[in-house]
From Swiss-Prot:
Keywords: Cytoplasm, Developmental protein, DNA-binding, Metal-binding, Nucleus, Transcription, Transcription regulation, Zinc. Residues 13-137 form the MH1 domain. Residues 199-216 have a biased composition (Low complexity). This is Mothers against decapentaplegic homolog 5. The gene is smad5. PROSITE patterns: MH1 (PS51075), MH2 (PS51076). Residues 270-464 form the MH2 domain. It is found in: Cytoplasm; Nucleus. It comes from Danio rerio (Zebrafish). Belongs to the dwarfin/SMAD family.
């Protein structure tokens, strides 16, 4: 009791009152400092304290915006930790497990939401709602499979390898993304495996039949396979079919009784991450159970399950370039899985470079484009809903069109050093330090759909 009384001995009555609505029992001292800093700001505004207390005491009732001045970088420092103000106070008074601003959306009644970039920002926790994962509609697969459903079709193609003939183009966030918001500057290909993207105004940039650079190593059993590449002549016939963006989830002219719905299921581990140095895999795969994962260059003696610490991994083939690059990874990248979307936030002092076909599709980029994310920036790199739409449409175009989507479920990311047309490194396997993120939910969904569809028209064989 003595320690508790000393904790609040110098706490103002206003702070004590506000702490009465605090959620969770962790980080008492941090919460007290956060509330104390807020009270000092609100006392300068007439009625602000009363408005906040009313909002906290009557959660279901309408309440006013409670604002504080926006700082230069938008963040607020509380006890040596910087964070976004609306996230800090939503964590204190509503959701102690809140990880990121990506998990919050403002209500329509809020006049000063954080995202509006006004001089004032609302920190009323009841002016924000938490993003919920959307329910993905089942994919309807025609009932004409002759394949034994006890076997996974993805396993059959695990040892396939292929080369990407096109050197990846490069883009920088946010500059390149603003340029492409209205459409694509890349030439259109009749062989595009996907329908027009939301950002490309009815056109999709040039998309070769082959995938991004594949890693020149044998993939172990727990790693998703490289994508299957159909024969060139078949892509010339079947791959050139265009897809309508508004097509039904069910195959056209297909009676409902002749389709098998395949539901999306959230896996226990939403992704796995594998680390590479040049073309060598280093260490074991990291399986992410938390929706917030840090991949950094440090060592972690506490063995935190939410961190993948690359500093712990050893490699006898490591050269001086790799050693130097590893020293600059620093805080690395923060991966969030929120509301069916994956975000990558660069915490490192140097940029990270991301190759995500789903992200490229959304922005109207070439599928293999490598996007540079500068320090302090975050980018959405995968959207489950867009993937679900593509999968539902691809089912109507055969096995190969669906299998093409496996390339979308693997995201490559390099630290410090980039690759592509604007860099002297043309392939990700030429970068000193990089990771491969495999999205388990979409991959498992694809596996189930492919199993229902049966074998491809041209059976795949290792014999040429």
């Amino acid at each position: 009791m003595t320690s508790m009384s000393s904790l609040f001995s110098f706490t103002s009555p206003a702070v004590k009152r506000l702490l009465g609505w605090k959620q969770g029992d962790e980080e008492e001292k941090w919460a007290e400092k956060a509330v104390d800093a807020l009270v000092k700001k609100l006392k300068k505004k007439k009625g602000a304290m009363e408005d906040l207390e009313k909002a906290l005491s009557s959660p279901g009732q309408p309440s006013k915006c409670v604002t504080i001045p926006r700082s230069l970088d938008g963040r607020l420092q509380v006890s040596h930790r910087k964070g976004l103000p609306h996230v800090i106070y939503c964590r204190v008074w509503r959701w102690p497990d809140l990880q990121s601003h990506h998990e919050l959306k403002p209500l329509e009644v809020c006049e000063y939401p954080f995202g509006s970039k006004q001089k004032e920002v609302c920190i009323n926790p009841y002016h924000y709602k938490r993003v919920e994962s959307p329910v993905l509609p089942p994919v309807l697969v025609p009932r004409h499979s002759e394949f034994n459903p006890q076997h996974s079709l993805l396993v059959q193609f695990r040892n396939l390898s292929h080369n990407e003939p096109h050197m990846p183009l490069n883009a920088t966030f946010p500059e390149s993304f603003q340029q492409h918001s209205g459409g694509s500057s890349f030439p259109i290909s009749p062989n595009s495996p996907y329908p027009p993207s939301p950002a490309s105004s009815g056109t999709y940039p040039n998309s070769p039949a082959s995938s991004g650079p594949s890693s020149p190593f044998q993939l172990p059993a727990d790693t998703p396979p490289p994508a299957y590449m159909p024969p060139d002549e078949q892509m010339g016939q079947d791959g050139s079919q265009s897809m309508e963006t508004g097509s039904s989830l069910a195959p056209q002219n297909m009676p409902r009784g002749d389709v098998q719905p395949v539901e999306y299921q959230e896996p226990s581990h939403w992704c796995s991450i594998v680390y590479y140095e040049l073309n060598n895999r280093v260490g074991e795969a990291y399986h992410a159970s938390s929706t917030s994962v840090l991949v950094d260059g440090f060592t972690d003696p506490s063995n935190n399950k939410n961190r993948f610490c690359l500093g712990l991994l050893s490699n006898v083939n490591r050269n001086s370039t790799i050693e130097n690059t590893r020293r600059h990874i620093g805080k690395g990248v923060h991966l969030y899985y929120v509301g069916g979307e994956v975000y990558a936030e660069c915490l490192s002092d140097t940029s990270i470079f991301v190759q995500s076909r789903n992200c490229n599709y959304h922005h109207g980029f070439h599928p293999t484009t490598v996007c540079k994310i500068p320090s302090g920036c975050s980018l959405k790199i995968f959207n489950n809903q867009e993937f679900a739409q593509l999968l539902a449409q691809s089912v109507n175009h055969g096995f190969e069109a669906v299998y093409e989507l496996t390339k979308m479920c693997t995201i490559r990311m390099s630290f410090v050093k980039g690759w592509g047309a604007e860099y002297h490194r043309q392939d990700v396997t030429s970068t000193p330090c990089w990771i491969e993120v495999h999205l388990h939910g979409p991959l498992q969904w694809l596996d189930k759909v492919l199993t229902q569809m049966g074998s491809p028209l041209n059976p795949i064989s290792s014999v040429s």
